[in-house]
From Swiss-Prot:
The active site is at H328, D384. GO terms for molecular function: citrate (Si)-synthase activity. This is Alkylcitrate synthase phiJ. InterPro entries: Citrate_synth-like_lrg_a-sub, Citrate_synth-like_sm_a-sub, Citrate_synthase, Citrate_synthase_sf. It comes from Fungal sp. (strain ATCC 74256). The gene is phiJ.
Length: 457
C-alpha cells in the first residue's frame, strides 16, 4: 500500500566515530538496509569490518522487511486483512469460496465464473492423480502418530514420484519468471496437501479414504477426503462449509509470519513449492507459532477444570507455565479477528456444553482480563486462543487442528511462493553478529558444562 508523500525523504546520519555524514533515501517509510554498508571505519590494509560496513542487528527480524509485496495489507478502519486491496467484508459479502480466494491471492485477480469453474475442476483432477505411494507411506505410521511427520512424509512421497517437479533434478530453473509453470505448480501443491490431510485423517480414524470427485469444490472434496460428512448423505454439512469459507478470509494469510519467512527463504534458492511448503509447515509446528494451538489444547486438558484456573494463572505469572494464545506481535492491543472468531462459534452452536475445555478457556479469559499482570502488559486473548475450538466445531480432531489450519493458510503460502517467482531472486544470506573470542587455543581444556564436559568427569 503506497504511503503519502510525507513517507518519502532522506535520513541524515552522522557517525560520531568519524564525524562523517551520510544521506540515506526513505521510500514509503522504508530504508534500504544495504545503504548502511557505506558507513564504515577508515582503516589501513585489509579489514573485515571495513569490507562489511555497518550492520543492522535485528534479532527475530522485528523491524525488517524482507520483500515488497502486493498480497496482504491491513484495513486501517477495521484492522482486518486487506487481500490484494479487497476488504474482508467485501469477500464475506461475496461468499468467497476457496477457488475464488486462491485465484485472488495467488494469481492476483478475482476469477470470472468460467475461470472459477476451470480452477475447481483442475484442483479435483490433481487430487485424483495423487499416486498410491503417498497413501502407502502415510499408512506405515501408527495411527497415533502426530500429524507433522506424516505430513512431511506424505508430501515427500509425492515429490519422489514426480522428480521433474524438482528444479535441481530437472536440471535448473523451472518456475522463476515462468508464470504458466508456477501457476500449475501452485495449484498442484494445494491439491496434494488436501489429499495428504485426508489420508492422514482417515488413517488416524481407521476409516476408508474416499477420493475426490471432479463435480465438487475444493472444500467439499477436502471434507469428504477427511471423512467429515453426514452419515446419511455422505456429503459435508453446507452450514459448516459456509462458516469455514468465512474463516478462509481471515486465516489464508497473516503477512510475513515466521512460516512465510521460512517459505520465502526456501523459495529464494528456486525450490519447488512442495519443498517450500514442507519447510514452512515444519517451522510453523513450533509452540510459538501454529504449534501453539496443539500446545494450548494440551494445557487446557492438564488444567482439567475451571476451578483450577486461578492456580494456573499464578504459575504463568511466576513464569512456571506458558499461556498460549495470549498477546500478539502484530496486534499490540485487541486482536481485530477475535470478534469474528467468537461469532463463528455462535453460528456453529459450539459452546462449553458441547466442549468442556471451552469452559476452562473462557475462565482463563475472564480472570486474565481482570488481572493487572496481564492488562498492564497489554496481554489479551488473540484469535488463536479460540480458533482451535472453531476447528473442533468444523469436525476436526484435536490433534489435527494445526494440520487443518494449513488447509486455509496454504493459500497464503502459495501466494508468497508465486510472488517470489515473479520477483528478482536474491538468495537469503543473512549475517550474524559474532561476539566470540578472536583467538582461542584448541588444546586448552574447556570449563564448559555441556555433555562433553560431563563425560570428562
Amino acid at each position: 500500500m503506497a504511503l503519502s508523500s510525507q513517507a518519502q525523504g532522506k535520513l541524515f546520519v552522522r557517525d560520531s566515530r568519524t564525524s562523517r555524514e551520510y544521506e540515506i533515501p526513505i521510500s514509503n517509510n522504508t530504508i534500504n538496509a544495504a545503504d548502511f554498508q557505506k558507513i564504515n571505519l577508515p582503516t589501513k590494509g585489509k579489514s573485515l569490518t571495513k569490507a562489511l560496513g555497518l550492520q543492522l542487528y535485528d534479532p527475530g527480524m522485528q523491524n525488517t522487511a524482507i520483500k515488497k509485496t502486493e498480497i496482504i495489507g491491513r484495513d486501517p478502519s477495521t484492522g482486518l486483512p486487506l487481500l490484494r486491496g479487497v476488504t474482508s467484508q467485501e469477500l464475506w459479502k461475496r461468499r468467497c469460496d476457496f477457488e475464488e480466494l486462491f485465484s485472488l491471492m495467488v494469481f492476483g485477480n478475482y476469477p470470472t465464473i468460467v475461470e472459477r469453474e476451470a480452477l475447481r475442476y483442475q484442483f479435483a483432477e490433481y487430487m485424483k492423480e495423487v499416486p498410491k505411494v503417498v497413501g502407502s507411506v502415510i499408512r506405515k505410521f501408527p495411527p497415533s502418530s502426530p500429524p507433522l511427520p506424516m505430513i512431511t512424509a506424505g508430501l515427500s512421497a509425492y515429490l519422489s514420484s514426480d522428480p521433474d517437479f524438482i528444479p535441481a533434478i530437472h536440471g535448473g530453473n523451472i518456475y522463476h519468471r515462468n508464470p504458466r509453470a508456477a501457476d500449475e505448480a501452485a495449484i498442484k501443491t494445494a491439491a496434494v496437501y488436501a489429499v495428504v490431510i485426508g489420508l492422514i485423517s482417515c488413517h488416524k480414524k481407521g476409516i476408508n479414504f474416499v477420493p475426490a470427485d471432479t463435480d465438487d469444490t475444493f472444500l467439499e472434496n477436502l471434507f469428504r477426503m477427511c471423512g467429515l460428512v453426514d452419515p446419511a448423505t455422505r456429503r459435508p454439512d453446507p452450514h459448516v462449509l459456509a462458516v469455514f469459507r468465512k474463516g478462509l478470509v481471515l486465516n489464508c494469510d497473516n503477512g510475513m509470519t515466521q512460516s512465510n519467512l521460512v517459505l520465502c527463504a526456501t523459495a529464494s534458492s528456486l525450490c519447488d513449492p512442495i519443498s517450500c511448503l514442507i519447510s514452512a509447515i515444519s517451522a510453523a509446528y513450533g509452540p510459538l507459532h501454529y504449534g501453539a494451538q496443539e500446545a494450548g489444547y494440551r494445557t487446557l486438558s492438564e488444567i482439567g477444570s475451571a476451578d483450577r484456573v486461578p492456580h494456573f494463572l499464578e504459575q504463568v505469572k511466576r513464569r512456571e507455565r506458558r499461556l498460549f494464545g495470549y498477546g500478539h506481535r502484530t496486534f499490540a492491543t485487541e486482536d481485530p479477528r477475535l470478534n469474528a472468531v467468537k461469532g463463528w462459534l455462535q453460528e456453529l452452536d459450539f459452546d462449553s456444553k458441547r466442549e468442556p475445555l471451552m469452559k476452562i478457556a473462557e475462565e482463563i479469559d475472564r480472570l486474565a482480563a481482570q488481572d493487572d499482570y496481564f492488562t498492564s502488559r497489554g496481554l489479551r486473548a488473540n484469535a488463536d486462543f479460540y480458533t482451535l475450538f472453531v476447528f473442533r466445531a468444523y469436525g476436526f480432531d484435536w490433534d489435527m487442528i494445526g494440520a487443518a489450519n494449513f488447509c486455509m493458510r496454504i493459500i497464503g503460502f502459495m501466494a508468497h511462493w508465486r510472488e517470489a517467482m515473479e520477483q528478482e531472486i536474491k538468495i537469503f544470506r543473512a549475517r550474524d553478529y559474532y561476539v566470540g573470542p578472536s583467538k582461542k587455543d584448541p588444546n586448552r581444556e574447556s570449563s564448559g558444562t555441556g555433555i562433553l564436559a560431563q563425560a570428562r568427569l
